[in-house]
Regions:
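Short, surface-exposed secondary-structure boundary micro-motifs
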Residues: 84-86
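Short peripheral tails and domain-boundary helices/loops at the edges of structured domains
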Residues: 99-114
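A contiguous, surface-exposed recognition patch within enzymatic or periplasmic domains that forms
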Residues: 1-78, 90, 95-102
Length: 114
């Protein structure tokens, strides 16, 4: 797990992860989950071969960005990268307490069975 507690000084963070999901705990007691397929044996073209990024553009927003692997397409061919999005009720941690990462994992795993 990597838990980001506040917007970083530089707006974009990149990571190499094959977990296949990212989640964001929102202050309105919702958990936003993105699931996606990973390809450990394929090349990723992000600057450092990263598979996910978290971006904090200006203003009150955040982007969770899974990155697909490189595709070489011939004229007329089509490529795609699918993300599944879910919202789940999940109490935002009170000031001075930690996010319950086991509960987050259980929520994500519950989507896998659907």
């Amino acid at each position: 797990f990597l838990e980001i507690l506040a917007a970083p000084r530089r707006p974009k963070l990149g990571f190499d992860s094959y977990a296949g999901w990212m989640a964001y705990a929102m202050k309105n007691d919702l958990l936003f989950v993105k699931k996606f397929k990973t390809y450990p044996d394929r090349v990723y073209n992000e600057v450092a071969g990263l598979t996910i990024s978290v971006w904090y553009p200006e203003g009150a927003r955040l982007e969770l960005e899974p990155i697909g692997p490189r595709e070489r397409l011939e004229p007329g061919e089509v490529g795609s990268f699918t993300e599944e999005w879910w919202l789940a009720p999940s109490r935002f941690p009170a000031t001075g307490t930690n996010l319950d990462l086991e509960r987050v994992t259980a929520i994500v795993e519950s989507f896998e069975s659907k």
